Amino acid sequence: MLTPIIRKFQYGQHTVTIETGMMARQATAAVMVSMDDTAVFVTVVGQKKAKPGQSFFPLTVNYQERTYAAGRIPGSFFRREGRPSEGETLTSRLIDRPIRPLFPDSFLNEVQVIATVVSVNPQINPDIVALIGASAALSLSGIPFNGPIGAARVGFINDQYVLNPTTDELKESRLDLVVAGTAGAVLMVESEADILSEEQMLGAVVFGHEQQQVVIENINALVAEAGKPKWDWQAEPVNEALHARVAELAEARLGDAYRITEKQERYTQVDAIKADVTEALLAQDDTLDAAEIQDILASVEKNVVRSRVLRGEPRIDGREKDMIRGLDVRTGILPRTHGSALFTRGETQALVTATLGTARDAQNIDELMGERTDSFLLHYNFPPYCVGETGMVGSPKRREIGHGRLAKRGVLAVMPSASEFPYTIRVVSEITESNGSSSMASVCGASLALMDAGVPIKAAVAGIAMGLVKEGDNFVVLSDILGDEDHLGDMDFKVAGSRDGVTALQMDIKIEGITREIMQVALNQAKGARLHILGVMEQAISTPRGDISEFAPRIYTMKINPEKIKDVIGKGGSVIRALTDETGTTIEIEDDGTIKIAATDGDKAKHAIRRIEEITAEIEVGRIYAGKVTRIVDFGAFVAIGGGKEGLVHISQIADKRVEKVTDYLQMGQDVPVKVMEVDRQGRIRLSIKEATTPDAEAPEAAE
């Protein structure tokens, strides 16, 4: 008999159930976690031995959504799930980020976490459920893991924090923040906000961390009941003698190398020092392990940089802790794009473009949570040349998808509504140089490019990356970190926002002991940096341009009676296709009768508007129109009277005398005056040539 072990607890307004012991018993650990009908099955498998020569920790996190979870069959040709969607990739990263720092530094065994969404309630996003499941499975597995962690989503509705808001509640929320951490420390924050203050953002982080303690307590209780024995794994003892010898040979030289401000020159010098030291030590003792020497050199290198910062000495590139690198801001640099900007901060540079399209250019996204249309796209590209390397060029990698999403979060709060600006907007950030915080450079460049394109954004936004070096109670917060400071520091803290508040916050912490005070210092320092960058950006462009590019489509909006939509579309789309070809415009019709006409030429748009007005104009009974014979039948002729309208002239209404044969009087394409005699309930028009040609008949109205 399979006997599951279950923990059930209340988590805000939801009930969470964690179950183990029933499924995937050959995995190292497996749990089924559910929150109000949203269920995620999470497995962990760890290899007992590391691969020989393994130099990094091979942790893989795969989050996958199954369409059966929502009672659907995939719409693809093969009717099965394919490559991960952007949403699945982002959630995989969301799980990876808080768990990765909790494995011991020298643990190099392969670990794979797979989270599969097997049931979904559209009101409950599976990402928090998957995070809880990954934490529970790792804690149960016995793998060396300094967890468990908890996870919470925090909303901000009516000036109150809301724990794990539903999908409907999030639509009313000014904040969507995910926080994960251990009992004593926040490890990861991912959020977007509607221009909230630093205090409100920090309050949300603290609130989420406090509330998730119930998750950690219940996972610990489950581990006590069902946890597997801890692995008999010990970190390799440090070779103190070799460490001292490496430090003696390399420390001073690395200190000098890290005074070289130019990145590539510094890297060349550091690589040369490492090669010299390794060669010298192996020459003295060829039994030494070159990989071990490299690991010790990396440790010495880290200590050199961190010690200088903690002593208050200038940073790698000579700056003080709160200084921003030199900025160069340019707009309108690409002549045929709709908007463009080149944003340079030190050795980080982004070429950003904005392109305007129509509603049919919007992205239709089919997710488990339901279908939606996205009319604002932001894509981030990180080619290998931006860091002076060669490499594969192709579809975006996980990192590019994640950085693009963060940059989009930073800009989203200031974007105009569809009613204010009915365009689909695509921003592309090409990172042409990178030495720290290219995602935040993308935020700055996106703001500039959107303004250059004439998009009426509510405010300019800028982003900044902060870092932290902490030893004991001594800590230093660094503004505008370099790539090396990110790699060698204890925290990566990215903040985007306008002059009035924060629009996005992302935080990844590698150590415990990050207090509210430290986060407060970092947020306040980031605000000063953000305002400085905004000041420089505003010198280049301070408000959106008054008009969009001459190469961008202009969208004109008109409204018709919804009952007339069928007339504009025509049978099988014949009328709207003819209109599009005739006027050279793009025409989109909504169910409420709103028509959007896009054209690069204003005269073409006006022509399309005039033709639609003709088609939708009410036919007046008793009025005489100039018509054209379009079809001849035995009992009469069909005559077009303009605006896509066509009526029947019965054989008895062609002439004053009896007509035996219609073709004796009318030919195809012949212009004839006709009088509207009747429009019946079905919209059919009865015409008369006889009545239109009487001596007292008025002059016909021209058909177009």
Swiss-Prot record:
Residues in the signal sequence: none
GO cellular component: cytosol
EC number: 2.7.7.8
Cofactor: Mg(2+)
Swiss-Prot/TrEMBL catalytic activity: RNA(n+1) + phosphate = RNA(n) + a ribonucleoside 5'-diphosphate
Record key words, sorted: Cytoplasm, Magnesium, Metal-binding, Nucleotidyltransferase, RNA-binding, Transferase
The protein's assembly and partners: Component of the RNA degradosome, which is a multiprotein complex involved in RNA processing and mRNA degradation.
Protein name: Polyribonucleotide nucleotidyltransferase
